[in-house]
Regions:
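Bacterial N-terminal signal peptides
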Residues: 7-16
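Extracytoplasmic small-molecule ligand-binding "clamshell" domains
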Residues: 25-95
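An extracytoplasmic/periplasmic, membrane-proximal ligand-sensing/linker region
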Residues: 28-53, 213-214, 219-223, 227-237, ...
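Bilobed "Venus flytrap"/periplasmic-binding protein-like clamshell domains
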Residues: 31, 36-61, 118-189, 197-201, ...
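A bilobed periplasmic-binding-protein/Venus flytrap-type ligand-binding module shared by bacterial periplasmic
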Residues: 40, 121-132, 261-278
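Acidic, polar ligand-binding/catalytic clefts
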Residues: 79-137, 145, 149
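Pocket-lining segment of extracytoplasmic ligand-binding domains
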Residues: 142, 148-276
Length: 340
């Protein structure tokens, strides 16, 4: 009995030393890696695989260790970051950042740039043969959206629909932008709201106010390259439909864009409030350098079926005041956005 008691004491002391060692270890060490979180706006396994590519590149550039996670929802991502204020970084959309900043002081360091654009849009998509032709036609129609914490997929469309006096019918939380597109493609929803980035056409610069589909009369010419990129003729498609092109090669022929929203600040790279400033700068600079390499396209940030960032640029908290205003105008609370 005495021996067992002594053994138990020794084990408890050893466990305490192990826990204390992990807690006291320098941030970025193997014992205390930097926690990197990705919102599940794309397929989780794609983000995990691409996240490891990103983590390996950062480790090579900085000597720091990183641990990649894809929580089950936007809300869970914010909660995880807030739970590790001195060790977390995450790639989260504008609405998630605004909520995280209010909840626990998350701080933005940078924002995405996609093919030169510091902003993006929400797209309302419908079957190409649908009888939905105007915004008001969405009244009573079934609506698929990625996640209630998605800025382009839910927050901005909610504001616009309510402001226009439009009440959708059945609401389907699809689980991601890909899934929302597929919900329309498979006939499970009459419309969906997803992210929109402008198409790329040689010798043509798309501007806000142009048709979201300047190629709509030639959609039967759509094709998917060996790299999984979606084209219509020589125009590359970059909106959410492109992310499911390998699963649904005829997605552009099957789904059209009804309209797009006003511009939205791009997704963020944010840090916990107590994350060391010098490491933030080091990580940002390493990511910018990494974005200029071919390997970037294999990372969660740069992959076409990931976040499709071209690079990232410094961002200020005030950039997200328009999103805060939308919350205030509609009286939205954190509970409204992240309700179960």
């Amino acid at each position: 009995m005495k021996f067992a008691r002594i053994l138990m004491i020794v084990l408890l002391v050893a466990l305490g030393v192990t826990v204390a060692t992990a807690q006291d270890a320098e941030l970025g060490s193997e014992e205390n890696p930097i926690q990197v979180f990705f919102v599940p706006s794309a397929e989780a396994q794609t983000l995990i695989t691409g996240g490891e590519v990103l983590a390996d590149a950062l480790t090579e550039a900085t000597g720091l260790s990183f641990e990649v996670s894809v929580p089950t929802s936007y809300a869970a991502t914010v909660e995880a970051m807030c739970a590790a204020p001195d060790a977390s970084m995450g790639f989260i959309p504008a609405a998630g950042y605004v909520i995280g900043n209010s909840r626990c002081g998350l701080e933005v360091e940078a924002a995405a740039v996609r093919f030169g654009w510091p902003v993006y849009w929400a797209a309302y998509i419908v079957p190409r043969d649908s009888d939905i032709y105007t915004f008001s036609d969405l009244e009573g129609r079934s609506w698929a959206y990625p996640d209630s914490g998605s800025t382009s997929g839910f927050i901005v469309p909610s504001v616009e629909l309510q402001s226009a006096g439009i009440t959708p019918g059945e609401e389907i939380e699809a689980g991601g932008h890909n899934q929302a597109v597929l919900a329309v493609y498979n006939g499970e929803a009459e419309f969906a709201t997803v992210y929109f980035s402008p198409p790329l056409t040689p010798n043509f610069n798309w501007n806000y106010g142009d048709l979201p589909e300047p190629y709509d009369l030639t959609v039967d010419e759509a094709f998917v390259t060996d790299e999984g990129r979606l084209f219509v003729g020589d125009t590359r498609i970059l909106d959410a439909r492109s992310a499911v092109a390998e699963q649904a090669p005829d997605v552009v022929d099957a789904i059209r864009i009804l309209r797009i929203s006003d511009a939205i600040p791009n997704d963020t790279m944010a840090f916990g409030p107590d994350f060391p400033e010098e490491l933030r700068t080091q990580i940002f600079e390493a990511l910018v350098a990494f974005s200029e390499t071919e390997a970037w396209a294999e990372s969660a940030l740069g992959a076409d079926d990931g976040y499709s960032w071209t690079t990232l640029a410094p961002a200020d908290d005030s950039n997200f005041d328009p999103v805060r205003l939308q919350f205030e105008v509609l009286g939205l609370t954190e509970e409204d956005v992240f309700a179960d």
